């Protein structure tokens, strides 16, 4: 295992500082996207919001990265895609469902019959990162 002290030191305001402009890279394991693929699940009693970065890869010409915010209560989930960049087309759609216990983050491939030829991104591969924000006010039944 790498010695993390080579790359990290204490930063200002209780942060971690990466030495020598070091960065973070992400690679798998990936999920393949079909209809209603569950990307993530979290309990609303533990977390209230999550920020996702999702990278989708369909083939050599179709790549996409999106930034998504999801905030939820026991009976409502709000999804905001606030940044999206791709090489040709949107590849995935993001939704969330919630019940009294947990939030499911759901991905669907874009299937667009209006394009010529018909565009179907079923089977695209995605990887993601998530930053979870804890619930500050406990749920009351």
What annotation goes with each model-predicted range?
Residues 16, 77-78, 101-103:
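Hydrophobic residues embedded in beta-strands of well-ordered beta-sheets
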Residues 53-64, 69-73, 109-112:
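Short, flexible beta-strand-to-coil junctions
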Residues 7, 64-72, 92-96:
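Broad, structure-driven detector of short, well-ordered beta-strand segments within folded domains
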Residues 1-22:
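Short, low-complexity N-terminal tether/leader segments at secretion or assembly junctions of large
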């Amino acid at each position: 295992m790498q010695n993390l002290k080579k790359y990290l030191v204490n930063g200002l305001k209780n942060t971690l500082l990466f030495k020598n402009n070091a960065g973070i890279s992400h690679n798998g394991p990936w999920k393949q996207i079909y209809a209603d693929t569950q990307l993530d699940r979290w309990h609303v009693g533990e977390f209230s919001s999550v920020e996702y970065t999702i990278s989708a890869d369909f083939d050599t010409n179709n790549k996409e990265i999106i930034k998504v915010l999801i905030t939820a209560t026991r009976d409502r989930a709000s999804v905001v895609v606030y940044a999206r960049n791709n090489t040709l087309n949107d590849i995935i759609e993001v939704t969330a469902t919630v019940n009294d216990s947990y939030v499911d983050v759901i991905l669907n491939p874009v299937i667009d019959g209006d394009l010529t030829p018909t565009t179907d991104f079923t089977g695209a591969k995605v990887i993601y990162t998530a930053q979870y924000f804890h619930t500050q006010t406990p749920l009351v039944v």
